[in-house]
């Protein structure tokens, strides 16, 4: 077997030279020592700067979710304007339909005889009847029977009904 067993050595990928690896480690140690030698005020200043940058990154990320882009804002405003235009068009249509209905109502209310050719003027404040009332015809019992309607005769009050 082997007389001198060597311990396996692991080499960093990309640097095959042990000397360059040792130099890099020495430089890293020196830089670490420089970082630890900072005064307390320098450390506090650096920490506050890091925290401020971290807070600004978080705020920027949060705002990117909650704020609306200019394109989206333009689209929303366009949709609102379209809705307002539709509402205006509908109200104009409704007003024109109301005017037409009033004219037709006025024409229906005018007498058909040639003696009454003067036109009545209807203002917007005049109430328009919305319900139609139908009068009931008064009929006698004989007319009801002639129409086929049979009703029970009314009972006169008797002693039994008066006692209760």
UniProtKB/Swiss-Prot annotation:
Its main location: nucleus. It is found in: Nucleus; Chromosome, Telomere. The keyword Disulfide bond does not apply. Keywords: Chromosome, Nucleus, Telomere. Residues 1-72, 95-164 are annotated as: Disordered. One of its GO terms (cellular component) is chromosome, telomeric region. Residues 111-123 have a biased composition (Polar residues). Transmembrane segments: none annotated. Residues 19-47, 58-72 have a biased composition (Basic and acidic residues). InterPro entries: FAM192A/Fyv6_N (IPR019331). It holds the Pfam family FAM192A_Fyv6_N. Involved in telomere length regulation and promotes fully efficient non-homologous end-joining (NHEJ) by a mechanism activated in postdiauxic/stationary phase. Belongs to the FYV6 family. This is Protein FYV6. It comes from Kluyveromyces lactis (strain ATCC 8585 / CBS 2359 / DSM 70799 / NBRC 1267 / NRRL Y-1140 / WM37).
């Amino acid at each position: 077997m082997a007389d001198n067993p060597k311990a396996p050595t692991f080499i960093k990928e990309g640097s095959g030279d042990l000397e360059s690896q040792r130099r890099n480690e020495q430089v890293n140690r020196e830089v670490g020592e420089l970082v630890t030698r900072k005064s307390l005020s320098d450390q506090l200043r650096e920490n506050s700067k890091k925290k401020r940058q971290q807070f600004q990154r978080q705020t920027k990320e949060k705002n990117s979710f909650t704020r609306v882009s200019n394109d989206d804002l333009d689209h929303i405003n366009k949709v609102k304007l379209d809705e307002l235009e539709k509402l205006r068009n509908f109200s104009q249509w409704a007003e024109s339909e109301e005017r037409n209905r009033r004219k037709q109502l006025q024409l229906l209310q005018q007498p058909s005889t040639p003696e009454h050719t003067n036109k009545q003027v209807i203002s917007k404040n005049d109430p328009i009847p919305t319900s139609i009332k139908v009068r009931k015809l008064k009929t006698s019992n004989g007319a009801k029977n002639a129409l086929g309607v049979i009703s029970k005769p009314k009972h006169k009050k008797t002693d039994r009904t008066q006692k209760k």
